[in-house]
């Protein structure tokens, strides 16, 4: 725990009443304060990898895509993505290896999930040796317009 000393000019009611009201120089009161660092936790999508995600495609729920990538899209555009086939090229930064990869985010009109497909297997599963049970996290970086990816728990 980090401790810091702050000085305040505020007095308790008793101190205020007992001091001379004509004296403009109020004493400063030191207070030792504990500062708890707030851990930055950016992960908007956290998934435990399944067999299907290791051999086929990485599923991303529509709600997560809507809340991240499509946060600033119009309601009409979001409504359209629910019933249409969508495919877009995206960048995914692997924060553990500091590499950037291209991927295709795809959505079938009958499914309610988006998916990273072919590039997911080559660029992440094989290269990073991902296995069933690993926990991965992703978040959308608005400044760089890309997903950021990391293995949060590599235990099997």
Swiss-Prot record:
Compartments where located: Nucleus
Q: Name one GO molecular function term.
A: DNA binding
Instruction: Extract the DNA-binding region annotation as residue ranges.
Output: 57-155
Transmembrane intervals: none
Query: Keywords on this record?
Result: DNA-binding, Nucleus, Transcription, Transcription regulation
Q: Show the coiled coil region(s).
A: none
Q: What is this protein called?
A: B3 domain-containing protein At5g26805
């Amino acid at each position: 725990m980090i401790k810091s000393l702050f000085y305040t000019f505020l007095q308790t009611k008793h101190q205020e009443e007992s001091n001379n009201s004509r004296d403009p120089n109020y004493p400063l009161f030191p207070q030792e304060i504990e500062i708890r660092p707030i851990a930055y936790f950016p992960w908007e999508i956290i998934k435990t990898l399944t067999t299907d995600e290791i051999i086929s495609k990485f599923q991303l729920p529509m709600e997560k895509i809507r809340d991240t990538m499509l946060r600033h899209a119009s309601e009409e555009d979001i409504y359209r993505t629910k019933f249409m086939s969508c495919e877009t090229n995206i960048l995914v930064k692997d924060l553990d290896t500091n590499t950037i990869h291209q991927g295709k985010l795809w959505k079938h009109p009958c499914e309610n999930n988006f998916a990273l497909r072919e590039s997911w297997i080559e660029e992440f599963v094989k290269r990073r040796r991902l296995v069933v049970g690993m926990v991965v996290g992703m978040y959308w970086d608005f400044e760089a317009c890309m997903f950021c990816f990391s293995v949060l728990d590599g235990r099997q």
